[in-house]
Amino acid sequence: MKKQADYIKRIEIKGLWGRKNISWDLRADVNILSGVNGIGKSTILNNSVRYLNELEGHALTNGVQPGVSFVFSPEDANFIRFDVIRSFDRPLINSGLLEKIGNSNVKTELDWQLYLLQRRYLDYQVNIGNRIIELLTSGVIEDQARAAEVSRPKTKFQDLMDDLFSETGKKINRRSNEILFEQDGDILTPYQLSSGEKQMLVILLTVLVQDNQPFALLMDA
């Protein structure tokens, strides 16, 4: 039986590059892996992501995989929900992918992440909309009060975006189902933001669409 973890307590990698053993004890909130270029930070992240992907759908005792193992909290959990953010704004070079997308605005890796997140954001809105309708029509007074709480994370996300972009006069368009911004009377798509603004949007939007569920966010910056 699958049991979801709240967070990863430890990552262990045996024989990294055939010579190093890595054991990384993790906090429940924020963990930073730092060091000079070439020390293996991205390699550790990539190995972790690869084996976390393999865990999905498999009842593996406490996350053990050949060469890589995870200790979860609680320790009898055998998988974890996770997302990966890579904040490099390099041009996309996969011509087949660009043709498949059919969106000329998607030109960089950050654009691609935003494109995928837009679709998840639409699904998120449908889900919370359905929950609000269910609560409002239940006939239970307490449920009607809870309905306002369902949309609170989305409102908080919008408020945060407005605050972060306040110096450039950008505000998120709260009437649109898609992520759009207003600036001096113009409508901007996320693809028109600066690289730094795209990075902030990707991080906050990734967290929002988790819908308050426990998950691990891995970032390569």
Range-by-range predicted roles:
Residues M1-A5, K9-K14, D25, N46-Q192:
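Phosphate-coordinating catalytic segments in nucleotide- and nucleic-acid-processing enzymes
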Residues I22-A28, E182, L208-Q210:
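Phosphate-binding P-loop
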Residues L33:
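Hydrophobic anchor at the beta1->P-loop junction of P-loop NTPases
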Residues G38-I39:
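ATP-binding Walker
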Residues S42:
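Walker A/P-loop
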Residues Y51, L193-L218:
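GG-anchored amphipathic helix commonly corresponding to the ABC/SMC/Rad50 NBD signature/C-loop
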Residues M161, M219-A221:
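Conserved Walker B
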